[in-house]
């Protein structure tokens, strides 16, 4: 019987783009010039360095992680796919949140695995004890969730992550930290050396403004990474992507400044919309805001009329808005404000 896998809906590319949680601005002219000067050193006729040595050293230096605990791939999506393919298959079960990142379902379906979901509370929070109880009852084979959560923006504490990881051991627990740079919580990376069933994925697509380059990482214990590296597709990253990533990772100050600007803009946006009645917006620890509106279709029409593209969750009364530039956020706020006052 032929499998039916629902296609992932890629982001729209026209208008004011506040739908894909990308960086709102391109890299600085200084970094772009450095990249241009580095291109002639690349041997385009040769396969890329499969050891990923320079890239893993650069990322490890920034994150304070040993390179032998790292693996890079074509976006963190590929790392998630590798983990799901390793631990799941026909008759196996993935356990995740609802709502959460839709690619988890996509990969699980591709490997003919089942997906068990646990509903988050109305405010995006998790009932951890109930989550653990359901997962144990269902005898799941892999636990996977984003933190901060995509789309709610809520972030679990490192102690909550530890509780989940220890409760499910030896079942693998994967924490997708695509948006962790925007959070004030402590990363699950601090648990890597003590929780042997824990994996963390990271990306350069969000905080590092490299969505167009597609570089992501998997992090775990040295023992786990030996197994994962043996299973990984060879030459997963091209030479150009690796070189660009290495250069950007060398400009930590610029990345930090960008992150702080986005966090400040996000917090200001949250403050302005917190008392709205027609629209309910969640506080967020990511680079986006999650909202709910009973009359969402009319709200979407208002955004469309303003030339602003936001993320619409079909079949639900929810939506998500990326924190863009100051002008983009103001334009999005004006749509919400005008809708609120109708």
Where are these regions (language model features)?
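Conserved PLP-binding catalytic core of the aspartate aminotransferase-like
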Residues: 263, 273-306, 323
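N-terminal "arm"/small-domain region of PLP-dependent enzymes with the aminotransferase-like
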Residues: 1-46, 61, 139
């Amino acid at each position: 019987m032929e499998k039916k896998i629902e296609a992932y809906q890629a982001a729209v590319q026209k208008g004011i783009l506040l739908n894909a949680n990308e960086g709102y601005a391109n890299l600085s002219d200084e970094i772009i010039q450095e990249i241009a000067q580095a291109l002639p050193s690349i041997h385009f006729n040769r396969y890329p360095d499969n050891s990923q040595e320079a890239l893993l050293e650069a990322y490890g230096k920034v994150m304070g992680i040993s390179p032998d605990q790292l693996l890079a791939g074509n976006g963190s999506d590929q790392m998630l796919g590798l983990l799901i393919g390793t631990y799941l298959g026909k008759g196996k079960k993935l356990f995740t949140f609802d709502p959460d990142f839709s690619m988890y379902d996509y990969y699980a379906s591709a490997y003919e695995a089942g997906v068990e979901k646990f509903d988050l509370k109305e405010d995006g929070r998790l009932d951890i004890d109930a989550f653990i109880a359901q997962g144990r009852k269902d005898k799941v084979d892999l636990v996977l969730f984003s933190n901060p959560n995509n789309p709610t923006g809520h972030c679990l504490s490192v102690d909550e992550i530890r509780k989940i990881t220890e409760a499910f051991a030896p079942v693998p627990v994967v924490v997708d930290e695509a948006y962790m740079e925007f959070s004030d919580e402590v990363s699950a990376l601090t648990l890597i050396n003590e929780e042997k069933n824990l994996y963390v994925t990271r990306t350069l697509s969000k905080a590092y403004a490299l969505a167009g380059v597609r570089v992501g990482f998997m992090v775990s214990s040295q023992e786990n990474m030996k197994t994962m590296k043996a299973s990984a597709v060879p030459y997963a990253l091209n030479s150009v992507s690796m070189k660009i990533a290495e250069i950007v990772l060398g400009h930590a100050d610029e990345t930090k400044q960008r992150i702080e600007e986005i966090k400040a803009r996000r917090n200001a946006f949250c403050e302005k919309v917190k008392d709205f009645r027609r629209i309910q917006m969640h506080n967020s620890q990511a680079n986006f805001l999650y909202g709910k509106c009973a009359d969402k279709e009319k709200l979407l029409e208002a955004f469309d009329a303003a030339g602003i593209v936001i993320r619409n969750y079909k079949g639900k009364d929810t939506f998500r808005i990326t924190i863009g530039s100051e002008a983009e956020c103001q334009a999005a706020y004006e749509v919400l404000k005008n809708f609120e006052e109708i």
